[in-house]
């Protein structure tokens, strides 16, 4: 559990203590609690195998949600969760569907991502409003929370990059296909085997059943194996990893949208 954070009491926390104590709060809102934000970030990741499009997207998203997080936390902008949450789900569907039809960064995508970032920032502000901010160290705590969110997002990207790295190396002619296939078979078997191993402590930490995280990873590893196995076809990584992952993300986002609007 996160350490207890003092919300009142005049000077009980220094600026540095407030800043440091809210970093894990922000991180926790992404990993493991922010499944919708995780899927959105993965939607950005699966657009392209190149770093530059990812940097453009993440920069636009970060700038936007930082603005609305601050405005929402200050109480200057308030939008009901009944509006924000369905729109966040819709944003997941949009980026995933665009990944299916576009193989690179379109001129409008950073602007659209910026707009979606404004929505996600309102979602962050809502969570932070429920958690509370110390009145005497409001700004340091807000900055710490936002940095925690950024660290969480970068962690998601880093983990997924490590998952697909060997497949990308083979696609670029830099890796050993046999070693890569062996690695992905082993990782798939391990991920699926761990799904049937009782891990109550891990499930409690994740606040979700362990297979919720491991099965998607196993599917990504399988896609990476196929992209190496059939590396002679056109755009194997996109065909076997990026597009299937984007389809899955779009389906989940669509389900959340329906659930948040109608159920």
Across the structure, where does each feature detected by a protein language model lie?
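Histidine-/acidic- and/or cysteine-rich, low-complexity loops and terminal segments associated
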Residues: 1-35, 127
